[in-house]
């Protein structure tokens, strides 16, 4: 609805509009949270991959150290490689699941947007609306 239509809406209609907008914002926030988690998981997976690339050619009995929480723990290369491979495999699975969730959340967001006829304003439209409201003029519907 335009600002003119919103001003003429009943309090019940305004409350319904507010709820629709809040739900849209919540869905968008959830989508952004999932995307951030995907990014974090992918970075962690790449980091494990880089470590694996570095140590795979070392002697199996060579010492290496791994930081677990705040403790540096001594291992041998042969003990760490399977753990790294397992971590990479698990992170790949989690990443795929999160990507699937991201796609589903995007579909849910688009459905909500279409169902409630939500249109995002461009920067220019937003500036014009703010300017018109500041001047006390209502924009064209």
From Swiss-Prot:
InterPro entries assigned: PFD2, PFD_beta-like, Prefoldin
Chaperone keyword on record: yes
GO biological process terms held by the UniProt record: protein folding
One term under GO cellular component: endoplasmic reticulum
Entry GO MF terms: protein folding chaperone; unfolded protein binding
Key words of the record: Chaperone
Gene3D superfamilies (alphabetical): 1.10.287.370
Pfam families: Prefoldin_2 (PF01920)
Family under the similarity heading: Belongs to the prefoldin subunit beta family.
Subunit structure: Heterohexamer of two PFD-alpha type and four PFD-beta type subunits.
Function: Binds specifically to cytosolic chaperonin (c-CPN) and transfers target proteins to it. Binds to nascent polypeptide chain and promotes folding in an environment in which there are many competing pathways for nonnative proteins.
Protein name per its UniProtKB record: Prefoldin subunit 2
């Amino acid at each position: 609805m335009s600002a003119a239509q919103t001003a003429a809406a009943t309090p019940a209609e305004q409350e319904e509009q507010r709820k629709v907008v809040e739900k849209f914002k919540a869905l968008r926030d959830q989508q952004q949270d999932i995307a951030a988690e995907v990014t974090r998981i992918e970075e962690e997976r790449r980091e494990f991959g880089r470590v694996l690339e570095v140590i795979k050619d070392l002697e199996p009995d060579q010492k290496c150290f791994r930081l677990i929480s705040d403790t540096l723990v001594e291992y041998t290369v042969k003990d760490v490689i399977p753990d790294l491979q397992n971590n990479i495999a698990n992170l790949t699975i989690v990443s795929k699941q999160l990507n699937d969730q991201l796609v589903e959340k995007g579909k849910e967001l688009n459905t909500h947007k279409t169902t409630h006829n939500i249109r995002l304003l461009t920067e220019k439209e937003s500036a014009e609306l703010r300017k018109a409201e500041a001047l006390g003029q209502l924009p064209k519907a």
